């Protein structure tokens, strides 16, 4: 099909082209987060874009399975899947490819996943993730490390108006499973509790043949969110061992997070199950003021690697890079766009000098593009500004002497002639004194 040049080429719903400015911002966010992961001792892993459906589905609940893109493999006849989540891939790799590595394993990744989404929802099908997995440690200290690292990464992006919302799925599951409720009633209640709809919760409970004590424990769940005062209220509702152990766990995690000095960024929500089906203990999500969706989320998943043949406790989380991008776009004081250093504008017929200077600057680590198209000074400067290049170097012409280069600051068109030998010194700085 021939697409007229006057219209935009169509894309499937839920995916986006990211032009250089946005691509720079995404790379900046990913780079900043990756730096934090590496400072905490994590090593990068790269997962494949395709998996066999029957293999990857071992690590997914029904919700993720329904969101998976599938198609036939012409080579094998088997069903292929584009992973909707990277954590099951990590579990497979750890269980089958990293048996010779000692535990604990500290792994991080940058990647993209695809998920089916309702067209009407306006949600993106493509999710950019930067995440970590800590495999082989079953301790509150490991859980606390994930939360503290999430806080540090968000602060490294210049954010301070965020909260990390802590949950504990075993607390919720313990109350639900000990209540005697049917599976259908538990599902209805889970939805109502997630909406903090106490009236709906009471209405559902009135129809259920369970004890009054069980009803009281469940009825309090929509109110179990806020600060640490929530723990005292939750303790009264925890009438089973599983929920009591969950409270002990989150209490110990909070004590460790106090040592990290991140308590001001924390809230607690024990009234619902956050995360995915494979989560099994402490979970958390991060929210930035003014944005309705989570910018990060994760938690403990102690049973996942066992599905691929290697039992090991684990915890981890991932950042939603596009959600963070929305946040940064609302913060004009943050400079996420990557600038380029030089555009080299050559007015001489001989290109040798321009080529040598450009390569010399690149060897010193400066990004340098040559304006190969023949155009005048003003048009080259306009091009540099549009492409977010900081400075333009002019070789030849009447702008300076033969042993000089004319250096122009693109933002305000101010220029100065400098000696070529000064430009090529190892200690050259981009700063121009005008």
Swiss-Prot record:
This function is generally fulfilled by the C-terminal part of HisG, which is missing in some bacteria such as this one. One of its GO terms (cellular component) is cytoplasm. It comes from the Bacteria. SUPFAM superfamilies: Class II aaRS ABD-related, Class II aaRS and biotin synthetases. It comes from Geotalea daltonii (strain DSM 22248 / JCM 15807 / FRC-32) (Geobacter daltonii). This is ATP phosphoribosyltransferase regulatory subunit. The keyword Lipoprotein does not apply. Heteromultimer composed of HisG and HisZ subunits. One of its GO terms (biological process) is L-histidine biosynthetic process. Pathway: Amino-acid biosynthesis; L-histidine biosynthesis; L-histidine from 5-phospho-alpha-D-ribose 1-diphosphate: step 1/9. NCBIfam families: hisZ_biosyn_reg, PRK12292.2-5. Signal peptide: none annotated. One of its GO terms (molecular function) is histidine-tRNA ligase activity. The gene is hisZ. Pfam families: tRNA-synt_His. Keywords: Amino-acid biosynthesis, Cytoplasm, Histidine biosynthesis. It is found in: Cytoplasm. Required for the first step of histidine biosynthesis. May allow the feedback regulation of ATP phosphoribosyltransferase activity by histidine. Belongs to the class-II aminoacyl-tRNA synthetase family. HisZ subfamily.
């Amino acid at each position: 099909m021939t697409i007229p040049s006057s219209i935009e080429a169509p894309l499937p719903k839920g995916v986006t082209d990211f032009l250089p400015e946005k691509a720079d911002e995404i790379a900046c966010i990913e780079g900043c987060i990756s730096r934090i992961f590496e400072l905490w001792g994590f090593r990068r892993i790269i997962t494949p874009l395709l998996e066999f459906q029957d293999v990857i589905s071992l690590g997914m609940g029904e919700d993720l399975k329904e969101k998976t893109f599938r198609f036939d493999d012409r080579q094998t006849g088997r069903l292929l899947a584009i992973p909707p989540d990277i954590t099951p891939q990590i579990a497979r790799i750890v269980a089958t490819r990293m048996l010779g590595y000692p535990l604990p394993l500290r792994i991080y990744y940058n990647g993209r996943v695809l998920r089916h989404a309702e067209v009407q929802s306006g949600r993106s099908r493509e999710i950019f993730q930067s995440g970590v997995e800590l495999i082989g440690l079953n301790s509150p200290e490991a859980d606390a490390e994930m939360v503290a690292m999430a806080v540090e990464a968000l602060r490294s992006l210049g954010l301070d108006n965020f909260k990390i919302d802590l949950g504990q799925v075993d607390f919720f599951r313990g109350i639900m499973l000990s209540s005697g409720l049917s599976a259908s009633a538990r599902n209805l209640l889970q939805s109502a509790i997630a909406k903090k709809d106490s009236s709906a919760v009471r209405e559902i409970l009135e129809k259920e043949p369970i004890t009054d004590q069980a009803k009281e424990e469940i009825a309090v769940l929509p109110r179990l969110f806020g600060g640490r005062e929530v723990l005292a209220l939750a303790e009264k509702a925890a009438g089973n061992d599983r929920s009591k152990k969950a409270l002990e766990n989150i209490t110990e995690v909070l004590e460790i997070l106090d040592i990290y000095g991140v308590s001001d960024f924390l809230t607690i929500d024990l009234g619902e199950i956050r995360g995915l089906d494979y989560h099994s203990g402490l979970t958390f999500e991060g929210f930035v003021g003014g944005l309705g969706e989570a910018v990060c989320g994760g938690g403990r998943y102690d049973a996942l690697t066992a599905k691929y043949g290697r039992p090991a406790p684990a915890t981890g989380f991932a950042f939603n890079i596009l959600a963070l991008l929305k946040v940064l776009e609302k913060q004009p004081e943050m400079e996420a766009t990557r600038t380029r250093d030089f555009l080299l504008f050559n007015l001489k017929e001989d290109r040798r000098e321009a080529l040598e200077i450009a390569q010399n600057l690149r060897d010193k680590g400066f990004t340098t593009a040559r304006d190969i198209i023949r155009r005048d000074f003003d048009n080259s400067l306009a091009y540099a500004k549009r492409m977010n290049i900081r400075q333009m170097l002019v070789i030849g012409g009447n702008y300076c002497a033969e042993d000089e280069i004319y250096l122009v600051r693109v933002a305000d068109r101010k220029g100065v002639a400098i000696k070529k030998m000064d430009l090529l010194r190892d200690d050259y700085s981009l700063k121009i004194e005008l």
